[in-house]
UniProtKB/Swiss-Prot annotation:
It comes from Leptospira borgpetersenii serovar Hardjo-bovis (strain JB197). GO terms for biological process: 'de novo' pyrimidine nucleobase biosynthetic process; 'de novo' UMP biosynthetic process; glutamine metabolic process; L-arginine biosynthetic process. The keyword ATP-binding applies. This is Carbamoyl phosphate synthase small chain. InterPro entries: Anth_synth/Amidotransfase, CarbamoylP_synth_ssu, CarbamoylP_synth_ssu_N, CarbP_synth_ssu_N_sf, Class_I_gatase-like, CPSase_GATase1, GATASE. Pfam families: CPSase_sm_chain, GATase. It catalyses: hydrogencarbonate + L-glutamine + 2 ATP + H2O = carbamoyl phosphate + L-glutamate + 2 ADP + phosphate + 2 H(+).
Length: 363
């Protein structure tokens, strides 16, 4: 079946459908990872986005339940150069095509993804849509232009859990950790549990006072989709957490929320960082880590906030982490849990546990 990729400037690219035969609109982004398409598709940070995978052949190893980062596909669509419908992997339980159809997600192959990626790098991430149809219709462009975009939209409310839940086991665990779910990935929860925390996950809108009353030793602010600026409730909760002196760890969107709560600003990036090969320098040690990233907004270091930067991206000098003098705080813009990506930064989960222990001993 034919499929059409339509951008908001009127560009039309024709290809072939290999997902659900429907249509979807969203922000068009690209990810440079060579593998990990299942983890990418199920990452809640991709809510309202259509993903272009730059690696030219996708689907080779199929789908396995252990590679899910949430309960479903979160992206709005998928764009690839060539789809492989015969996976070679003893663990594969289904094809990528079947997986997409189960969750009613359209996908298009036969697209010049190099050309599309170069366009995005030059012009910024456009709004666009995938439309599965026998012929092109002018209505497709109208639907793309009606998409409101990512900026100014609270997407954390869309992907957060509706109820509080316990992750892993609490038996024998010394410290309770409250996780704010703005779109948390499963592997983050696994690694927090493995670090020794008794993990409880809370909906994004849960008042900080309610969690404090229940009892916790520390807080974690998760990754999530879109623009952090509209999340007033999250910024307010973070300020209350810091007023009480709780140890705090934020990843990706969580890092941005902490930045806003400290008086810094955020901005939308031209095309963002999405892939598993971003070099980041730890400014306290001088060590460079290769990191997995997925974000389209960044904290600005405009010099107006006194809080120092702790990590820096070596490709474009964007802020990758911030500190607060005298406060038990750890933030990173990147994804230390990888899934997919390198494991260079997984030590941060144990580092946070040690930070909590040091803080509790000092009280």
């Amino acid at each position: 079946m034919k499929a059409f990729l339509v951008l908001d400037n009127g560009m039309i690219l024709e290809g072939e459908s290999f997902g659900y035969e429907s249509e979807s609109v969203g922000e068009i982004v690209f990810n440079t990872s060579m593998a990990g398409y299942q983890e990418i598709l199920t990452d809640p940070s991709y809510c309202n986005q259509i993903i272009t995978l730059t690696y030219p052949m996708i689907g080779n190893y199929g789908i396995h339940p252990d590679n899910m980062e949430s309960s479903k596909i979160q992206a709005s669509g998928l764009i690839v150069r060539e789809y492989v419908d015969l996976p070679s992997n003893f663990m594969s339980q289904k094809t990528l095509s079947k997986f997409l159809k189960e969750y009613q997600i359209p996908a298009i192959q036969g697209i010049d993804t190099r050309k599309l990626t170069r366009y995005i790098r030059t012009n910024g991430s456009p709004n666009g849509g995938i439309f599965v149809a026998r012929e092109y219709s002018p209505e497709f462009l109208e639907k793309v232009k009606s998409f409101p975009g990512i900026t100014g939209t609270d997407l954390a409310k869309v992907v957060t859990t509706s109820t509080k839940y316990i992750f892993g086991t609490h038996t024998g665990k010394k410290y309770k950790l409250a996780v704010y779910d703005y779109g948390v990935k499963t592997n983050i929860l696994r690694l927090l549990d493995a670090a020794g925390f008794a993990v409880t996950v809370y909906p994004a809108l849960t008042p900080a006072e309610e969690i404090m009353k229940e009892g916790t030793d520390a807080f974690f602010l998760s990754n999530g989709p879109g623009d952090p600026a509209p999340l007033d409730y999250a910024i307010d909760a973070t300020r209350k957490i810091m007023e009480k002196g709780y140890p705090l760890f934020g990843i990706c969107l969580g890092h941005q929320i902490i930045g806003l709560s400290l008086g810094k600003k955020t901005e939308k990036m031209k095309f963002g960082h999405r892939g598993g090969n971003q070099p980041v320098k730890n400014l306290s040690t001088g060590q460079v880590e290769i990191t997995s990233q997925n974000h389209g907004f960044a904290v600005i270091d405009d010099g107006k906030s006194s809080e120092p930067v702790s990590f820096l991206n070596l490709n474009d000098n964007t802020v990758e982490g911030i500190l607060k003098s005298g406060y038990p705080l750890l933030t990173v813009q990147y994804h230390p849990e990888s899934a997919p990506g390198p494991n260079d930064s997984r030590y941060l989960f144990q580092k946070f546990y040690d930070l909590v222990e040091t803080t509790k001993r000092g009280k």
